[in-house]
Amino acid sequence: ILDGCHWFNCDVGLYGTEHGQTVVNKYLELLESLKNLNIILEKFHITEYVYQKLYNNQEYDFSEVETRLKKLDAKIILTSFQEDEDLIKKRLEDRINLYPHYAKIAQEPAEYIKQQQEYLDIIKQSKLDYLIVDSSQLPNQKLVDDILIFLGEK
């Protein structure tokens, strides 16, 4: 499915800090330089917005970023999950087993639920086409099919 795609995990610990908007702008410059390639960004400007709001009580205006992204025909796929603390605890255990260093930044399930609520609120303000998918149950072929249809790949 991802043949020919380039993937960037953009959340490298700088969103929600004084460097967050610089990171967003640099990735945006990179996207504009690579505009003829298929690129997946894991967490981008919406994450900067959520982190600034939750952790610094600041509103981040991402309208200019989205204007530039719109010119690139960018789309957003927001993965959501059931707001079930037991499910979140299980996912955290799995992640920490795979990546033990994640334990240093892992949060309580209630914090992930709070973040998700912010994501779901702010996505409605996006100028970009977006799709919200529930990733509570994985693997999930219907979820994959929905994403491919949204992207025009199926």
Per-region residue spans from a language model:
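Hydrophobic/aromatic beta-strand patches that form the interior of the parallel beta-sheet core
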Residues: 1, 40, 75-79, 131-133
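Conserved substrate/cofactor phosphate-moiety recognition/catalytic segment
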Residues: 1-38, 50-53
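Well-ordered, non-membrane alpha-helical segments in soluble/globular domains
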Residues: 20-28, 55-65, 108-117, 144
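A basic- and aromatic-enriched beta-loop-alpha substructure that forms the phosphate/nucleotide-
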Residues: 27-72
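Conserved nucleotide-binding/hydrolysis micro-motifs of P-loop NTPases
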Residues: 45-47, 81-88, 138-139
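Short aromatic-enriched loop/helix-cap "lid" or pocket-rim segments at secondary-structure transitions
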Residues: 52-53, 88-93, 145
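A glycine- and Lys/Arg-enriched "phosphate-lid" helix/loop adjacent to the NTP-binding pocket
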Residues: 59, 67-118
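NTP-dependent small-molecule kinase module
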Residues: 97, 116-154
